[in-house]
């Protein structure tokens, strides 16, 4: 019993669970329910992220569809950032901050508030890692927004955005950057971000098939 109590009161466990719960806040679902009386999990792809929110609202002719989708994107991004910010604020080790980041991503994709359903996690991914690898993340965010704006294919923008940040972790750590944001110096491996990218590919498996067969829908 003492071992269980020690485990449950361990600050690392507490913050990992907290990260999962914060990431699990279903902003897209909540806003759609409150303002439009719609269950986003039963519309389109069933995802709770900005893309499905946009498509659902546009299909109903809602005039502020893009503004609502942008709000969902920002909130999903900031919840990941907030989870990691808290772990930094309370002095958790850098490697454990990555655990909190991953927990927040899993929380978004498998929300405990929606029977473990959720979204594909890209907004939360970019938000959670921006405080850990800011240079790589900001470039990845730029690629994400640029591809999304120009090509209007959300899945491709997401994959390229996270992919860019992942590729850069094999180059940026060798530059003259502070150790506090150097994944190679602090963790000794790029594995956490690589795993996040693999997870992104898995979550977008259907989209990748559609991209390869020319069936992927654009976001208008």
UniProtKB/Swiss-Prot annotation:
It comes from Helicobacter pylori (strain J99 / ATCC 700824) (Campylobacter pylori J99). GO terms for molecular function: acyl-phosphate glycerol-3-phosphate acyltransferase activity. Its main location: membrane. Belongs to the PlsY family. One of its GO terms (biological process) is phospholipid biosynthetic process. It is an enzyme of class 2 (transferase). It is found in: Cell inner membrane. The chain crosses the membrane at residues 11-31, 70-90, 96-116, 127-147, 153-173, 192-212. It comes from the Bacteria. This is Glycerol-3-phosphate acyltransferase. The gene is plsY. One of its GO terms (cellular component) is plasma membrane. It catalyses: an acyl phosphate + sn-glycerol 3-phosphate = a 1-acyl-sn-glycero-3-phosphate + phosphate. Pathway: Lipid metabolism; phospholipid metabolism. It is a multi-pass membrane protein. Keywords: Cell inner membrane, Cell membrane, Lipid biosynthesis, Lipid metabolism, Membrane, Phospholipid biosynthesis, Phospholipid metabolism, Transferase, Transmembrane, Transmembrane helix. Catalyzes the transfer of an acyl group from acyl-phosphate (acyl-PO(4)) to glycerol-3-phosphate (G3P) to form lysophosphatidic acid (LPA). This enzyme utilizes acyl-phosphate as fatty acyl donor, but not acyl-CoA or acyl-ACP. Probably interacts with PlsX. Its EC number is 2.3.1.275.
